[in-house]
């Protein structure tokens, strides 16, 4: 009987302890849940100087969705912010000097994450050009050279595309949408639906989301701390010091060439990803710039 009483007392203490732990864990979970921040859609917002009609319920809700998706996509958004410090100043300068609104710098952010990505459709580079479109806009794409992998040259190609698109639509939001759907795709949708602006169009999910992702990235990048991203200056990636080599004649072996110039093939490929083979054959009166670390 005494043994049974001891068992009951011990078991009771165990249950009390378990309940206390469960209650403590529940309170901790509730506190953690309460720390999740809800972000408000701005009262007004623009893209490329054009007002976004946030009074429309679907526009507001789609923007709200992308704000939260991208705010809580922590690792990806942090890396985008880090890379942006290296690339967006250069991209912005090219856009502005060619009369393209600076907000278009956010297109390569969502297109490729500011990396030389390759899509399942074989779109390549920061600006995700397909080979035919790249050639149409002045890029060299062949067996040895693929300038879609050159962030600077491909930005100039994007400028050409966007100028043609805006000449067609006279609207920068629609021009941005055409970068995803194609000029003809947006134009056909406008004709069939008898409207002439993006926010009145019923479009495929990908293109619709594309614009709102751009808006969300712009909001976050313009005020990262507001959305929970607090990076110190040392956290960012910055442009590296590089030395230019003007190439005026063919190079039969790029590995040997890089070693001769105090570098190696790995560094050559890092700073010149547009070189697709171990050789560079120049046509008459053609030259290129190759970059290597400036030691």
Each PLM stretch: what is its role?
Residues 205-228:
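Catalytic cores of secreted or luminal carbohydrate-active enzymes
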Residues 232-262, 286:
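Primarily a LysM-type cell-wall glycan-binding module
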Residues 4, 13-99:
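An acidic, Gly/Ser/Thr/Pro-rich helix-cap/linker signature
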Residues 73, 77-88, 97-100, 119-127, ...:
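Solvent-exposed, acidic/flexible segments
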Residues 271-295:
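Extracellular LysM carbohydrate-binding repeats and other cell-envelope/extracellular binding modules
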Residues 122-143, 155-158, 162, 186-189:
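Substrate-binding/active-site groove segments that recognize
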Residues 162-189:
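Catalytic and binding regions of secreted/periplasmic enzymes and modules that target cell-wall glycans
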Residues 100-115, 175-181, 218, 268-271:
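Short, functionally critical alpha-helical segments immediately adjacent to catalytic or ligand/cofactor-binding
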């Amino acid at each position: 009987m005494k043994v049974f009483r001891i068992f009951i007392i011990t078991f009771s203490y165990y249950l009390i302890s378990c309940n206390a732990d469960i209650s403590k864990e529940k309170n901790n979970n509730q506190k953690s849940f309460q720390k999740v921040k809800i972000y408000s859609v701005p009262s007004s917002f623009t893209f490329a100087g054009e007002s976004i009609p946030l009074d429309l319920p679907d526009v507001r809700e789609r923007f709200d969705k992308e704000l939260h998706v991208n705010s809580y996509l922590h690792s990806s958004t942090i890396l985008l912010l880090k890379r942006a410090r290296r690339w967006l100043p250069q991209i912005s300068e090219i856009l502005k000097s060619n009369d393209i609104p600076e907000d278009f710098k956010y297109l390569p952010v969502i297109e490729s994450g500011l990396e030389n990505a390759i899509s399942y459709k074989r779109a390549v580079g920061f600006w995700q050009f397909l080979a035919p479109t790249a050639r149409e806009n002045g890029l060299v794409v062949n067996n040895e050279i693929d300038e879609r992998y050159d962030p600077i040259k491909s930005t100039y190609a994007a400028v050409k595309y966007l100028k043609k698109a805006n000449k067609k639509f006279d609207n920068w939001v629609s021009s941005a949408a055409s970068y995803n759907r194609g000029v003809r795709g947006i134009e056909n949708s406008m004709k069939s639906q008898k409207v002439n602006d993006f926010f009145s169009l019923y479009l495929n999910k990908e293109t619709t989301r594309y614009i709102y992702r751009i808006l969300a990235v712009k909001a976050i990048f313009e005020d990262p701390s507001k959305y929970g991203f607090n990076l110190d200056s040392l956290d960012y990636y910055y442009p590296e010091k590089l030395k230019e080599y003007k190439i005026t004649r063919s190079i039969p072996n790029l590995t040997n060439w890089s070693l001769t110039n105090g570098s190696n093939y790995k560094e050559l490929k890092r700073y010149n990803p547009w070189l697709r083979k171990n050789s560079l054959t120049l046509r008459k009166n053609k030259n290129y710039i190759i970059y290597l670390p400036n030691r």
